[in-house]
Amino acid sequence: MNRPERLQPGVKLRDADKVSRIPVKIVPSERETMLRKPDWLRVKLPASNQRILEIKQALRSNGLHSVCEEASCPNLAECFNHGTATFMILGAICTRRCPFCDVAHGRPLKPDADEPVKLAQTIRDMKLKYVVITSVDRDDLRDGGAQHFADCIREIRKLNPEIKIEILVPDFRGRIDAALDILSTEPPDVFNHNLETAPMHYRKARPGANYQWSLDLLKRFKERHPNVPTKSGLMMGLGETNEEIAQVLRDLREHKVEMLTLGQYLQPSKFHLPVERYVSPAEFDELKVLADELGFTHAACGPLVRSSYHADLQAQGKEVK
């Protein structure tokens, strides 16, 4: 039996190379079998792309990454044109192979020790008032990257004392207590960790993750920081039912999560998990009603909603869909 070829540091694996060794194999989609995208998912491009180019240049010149680009987010043009971006720290190579996600897999490079300062300077130069900081999974690091998150929060606040910071963290697999100890030194204004889908779909969609671990991470952070809102996001269209999603919402509330994002899964390439259904705006509205009834303080539910989509407005309690 041939051993898998050893990954070279810094080499990005995408598409078929990325998903070749996941537990549930994916048959590449054929155009004829792919569901037709409904009109409500067609994104209008802004009239001017000048602001988009400016933000991309600011990221490039400082060696920074945005999840907007790395994950091929459909809202990139809208968010960049409004001067907002979700920064992705700890590099652009993930140690996981989630087949719904377009971020590259591989063996990451050592974290950039200068990234926290560069990030803080870029945010100051962009005059941002609210930022979302996320990262790839870093199972290669003993703390899962928690110290780097704390360093970034500290440096951002040094240069931007009035800013609000939301962090969208990985699951810190096997390191929850150590990670939360570190994050307690520099707690964010919003703590976000995405469950992504219902538990019965984890094996195919989130290999290496565990539904209960993720719920425990959210609850244990909340126990340490009762005044910091906790938040989670889900995708629809991976084979789940509306009732399965409703149960996830109940689980989130039982674990003291207050903010919710719920959006439509879109297939990044033919090598990723196929879209099994397009959920109508009316169904998202029904789930929004349920979320409100369950006691979520903020619930953004709609086809194009993503976990950091208009995160500043979500945090202010304004309706986003």
Swiss-Prot record:
Q: Which organism is it from?
A: Shewanella sp. (strain MR-7)
The listed locations are:
Cytoplasm
This one is known as: Lipoyl synthase
Task: Give the EC number.
Answer: 2.8.1.8
Which superkingdom, per the lineage? Answer: Bacteria
Q: Look up keyword Cell inner membrane and say if it applies.
A: no
Major localisation = cytoplasm
Residues binding [4Fe-4S] cluster 2, per UniProt: 94, 98, 101
* Residue ranges occupied by any Radical SAM core domain in the UniProt entry: 80-297
Q: Which GO terms describe its cellular component?
A: cytoplasm
| UniProt-recorded Gene Ontology molecular function terms | 4 iron, 4 sulfur cluster binding; lipoate synthase activity; metal ion binding
Cofactor binding, per record: Binds 2 [4Fe-4S] clusters per subunit. One cluster is coordinated with 3 cysteines and an exchangeable S-adenosyl-L-methionine.
Residue sites binding [4Fe-4S] cluster 1 per the record: 68, 73, 79, 308
| The keyword Iron appears for this protein | yes
Q: Which PROSITE patterns match?
A: RADICAL_SAM (PS51918)
Catalytic activity reported: [[Fe-S] cluster scaffold protein carrying a second [4Fe-4S](2+) cluster] + N(6)-octanoyl-L-lysyl-[protein] + 2 oxidized [2Fe-2S]-[ferredoxin] + 2 S-adenosyl-L-methionine + 4 H(+) = [[Fe-S] cluster scaffold protein] + N(6)-[(R)-dihydrolipoyl]-L-lysyl-[protein] + 4 Fe(3+) + 2 hydrogen sulfide + 2 5'-deoxyadenosine + 2 L-methionine + 2 reduced [2Fe-2S]-[ferredoxin]
Q: In which pathway does it act?
A: Protein modification; protein lipoylation via endogenous pathway; protein N(6)-(lipoyl)lysine from octanoyl-[acyl-carrier-protein]: step 2/2
Q: Which SUPFAM superfamilies match?
A: Radical SAM enzymes (SSF102114)
Q: Where are the transmembrane segments?
A: none
Print the keywords alphabetically.
Answer: 4Fe-4S, Cytoplasm, Iron, Iron-sulfur, Metal-binding, S-adenosyl-L-methionine, Transferase
Cofactor(s) needed for function: [4Fe-4S] cluster
Q: Which SMART domains match?
A: Elp3
